[in-house]
């Protein structure tokens, strides 16, 4: 394992009056994921993200889900972004850019990532009905209107540029999951060590 790979781990603890979060992340893992947020569909999405990014990821979140899942989902995305930024360190030797198209049945989603140090998020293409759709396989439902906020929180706190778009789709579950998986695959490419690059992949010399 190279020096670039050896240090690419992070542990983030984030505590507020609304949530208590511990995240452990290894960018050079094999997709071992263990997620408990109290929001079962969000667990499913973060498990997909970690698995398809080939990250080792442990998430433990206790939040005020008796009010609503929003705080738990948002705060976990903030902490995950912070963990990603911490694990990347000075970003030496990474590919920096990544993108992926992910189909899921009738849905097609695309994500593009630049590990630029300049946080930005563009999210587009979700059908209007996702503004009021609920995925409710448990007592703590996931409202798909939160999708954009998850990606924004991840990008802002990881300090990456993230573009996520839905080209087409119908089922809220498929649309949401395809986006998480597209982000995962794009991140996997972007943070991967580049054997031809030993320095920071920027003409500025810093990211």
Swiss-Prot record:
Record's subcellular location: Cytoplasm
Under Enzyme Commission nomenclature, its number is 4.2.1.19
What NCBIfam families does the entry give?
PRK00951.1-6 (NF002110), PRK00951.2-1 (NF002111), PRK00951.2-4 (NF002114)
Q: Which family does it belong to?
A: Belongs to the imidazoleglycerol-phosphate dehydratase family.
Coiled-coil regions listed in the entry: none
InterPro entries, per the entry: IGPD_sf, ImidazoleglycerolP_deHydtase, ImidazoleglycerP_deHydtase_CS, Ribosomal_Su5_D2-typ_SF
Output this protein's name.
Imidazoleglycerol-phosphate dehydratase
Which pathway? Amino-acid biosynthesis; L-histidine biosynthesis; L-histidine from 5-phospho-alpha-D-ribose 1-diphosphate: step 6/9
One Gene Ontology term from the biological process aspect of the record:
L-histidine biosynthetic process
A GO cellular-component term linked to this record: cytoplasm
Which SUPFAM superfamilies is this protein grouped with?
A: Ribosomal protein S5 domain 2-like
Q: Which reaction does it catalyse?
A: D-erythro-1-(imidazol-4-yl)glycerol 3-phosphate = 3-(imidazol-4-yl)-2-oxopropyl phosphate + H2O
Annotated keywords = Amino-acid biosynthesis, Cytoplasm, Histidine biosynthesis, Lyase
Q: Which GO terms describe its molecular function?
A: imidazoleglycerol-phosphate dehydratase activity
Record keyword Transit peptide present: no
